[in-house]
From Swiss-Prot:
It is found in: Cytoplasm. Residues 19-26 are annotated as: G1. This is Elongation factor Tu. One of its GO terms (cellular component) is cytosol. Gene3D superfamilies: P-loop containing nucleotide triphosphate hydrolases, Translation factors. Its main location: cytoplasm. GTP hydrolase that promotes the GTP-dependent binding of aminoacyl-tRNA to the A-site of ribosomes during protein biosynthesis. GTP binds at residues 19-26, 83-87, 138-141. Residues 138-141 are annotated as: G4. The keyword Heme does not apply.
Length: 397
């Protein structure tokens, strides 16, 4: 068999397993690495169940999350796969964006069918904008009755459709992660069938460099004789010397200017791109006019807003969060990209209060406008201490 080698030009896709506790997310993740290791050993190391299950903890926006990262390759693509073992870890990951997903494999045990967390995970996936979900109907070896499996499949499809995913069309693949992990060839083939479905159906993500330019401003200083420089890490897109840009946020109106120089590590460049830490020299703008918390963008692509709806996770006391609940008109700081802005919280109708450890929807009114799009993530802070994390789901004004 010809050796497949790691090609830089293979598309890179972020994927994850979601679903109810004990339905087999982690076993499936391990089984995928085993089956691919057996098929293309030079491309894929095998990652045993224990390694994924004992995922290291990591911090995202001040929140500790246990999450496992494994990598593997099919013939078509290179995948980074995340598996959050605990339900709370999954919720926190989705809201903080510790690991972004271009697509998700919803794991449902054929023996149980959809359970409460199955629904909650799908709802969250929609709210945080996971573009595509397909289904692994796991433990299929344990159900002999074809009618029962068909019924479970129908329930899962209805659940996906209810959350505006194309439930009628998504692939539902019957697998036994445990049997595949134990080396059963027939069930191993079903894992390959699942991966083929992932290859074929999860869309190629838009590359960060293809998106419109945006750089959050971290610092501003003036260089005598040259003008004002703003520094930061380019979040998306590319910037070329002599391109027009706007500075958006904090102020009522955007400031228009031209980038006359791009500098990285004290060297002048023609272009800066997503991921680069750069200094941008800007024409005709005084240092006092610009501040941290504004963003530099391609003109007309991003607007400043003060009112939005969000899905948030509030840290539990054990995680270093609040010890007490909060109520309507709670006024914390909202930390967007590089700066804190105070905002007033309105809770959904019927929600009296929010307890530490809860996730909830809320409306927020900021005292200063911030450049935002739906999907923007933020931390909720009190006196510099993180007490929650959230994601903008809808912008009002």
């Amino acid at each position: 068999m010809a050796k497949a080698k790691f090609e830089r030009d293979k598309p890179h896709v972020n994927i994850g397993t979601i679903g109810h506790v004990d339905h087999g997310k982690t076993t499936l993740t391990a089984a995928i690495t085993k089956v691919l290791h057996d098929k293309h050993p030079e491309l894929n190391p095998f990652t045993p169940f224990d390694e994924i299950d004992k995922a290291p903890e990591e911090k995202q926006r001040g929140i500790t999350i246990q999450i496992a990262h494994v990598e593997y390759q099919t013939e078509k693509r290179h995948y980074a796969h995340v598996d959050a073992p605990g339900h709370a870890d999954y919720v926190k990951n989705m809201i903080t964006g510790a690991a972004q997903m271009d697509g998700a494999i919803l794991v449902v045990a054929a023996t149980d069918g959809p359970m409460p967390q199955t629904r909650e995970h799908v709802l969250l996936a929609r709210q945080v904008g996971v573009p595509y979900i397909l289904v692994a109907l796991n433990k299929a070896d344990m159900v002999d009755d074809e009618e029962i499996i068909e019924l479970v499949e129908m329930e899962v499809r209805e659940l996906l459709s209810a959350q505006e995913f194309p439930g009628d069309d998504v692939p539902v693949v019957r697998v036994s992660a445990l049997k595949a992990l134990e080396g059963d060839a027939e069930w191993g083939d079903k894992i390959m069938e699942l991966l083929d479905a992932v290859d074929e159906n999860v869309p190629d993500p838009e590359r960060e460099t293809d998106k419109p330019f945006l750089m959050p401003i971290e610092d501003v200083f003036s260089i005598t004789g040259r003008g004002t420089v703003v520094t930061g890490r380019i979040e998306r897109g590319v910037i070329n010397v002599n391109e027009e840009v706007e500075m958006v946020g904090i102020k009522e109106k955007p400031l228009k200017t031209t980038v006359t120089g791009v500098e990285m590590f004290r060297k002048l460049l023609d272009q800066g791109q997503a991921g680069d830490n750069v200094g941008l020299l800007i024409r005709g703008i005084k240092r006092e006019e610009v501040e941290r918390g504004m963003v530099v963008v391609k003109p007309g692509t991003t607007t400043p807003h003060t009112e939005f709806e969000a899905q948030v996770y509030i840290l539990s006391k054990d995680e270093g969060g609040r010890h007490t609940p909060f109520f309507n008109n709670y006024r914390p700081q909202f930390y967007f990209r590089t700066t804190d802005v105070t905002g007033v919280v309105t809770l959904p109708e019927g929600t009296e209060m929010v307890m530490p450890g809860d996730n909830t929807e809320m409306s927020v009114q900021l005292i200063q406008p911030i450049a935002m799009d739906e999907g923007l993530r933020f931390a909720i802070r009190e006196g510099g201490r993180t007490v929650g994390a959230g994601r903008v789901t809808k912008i009002h004004k």
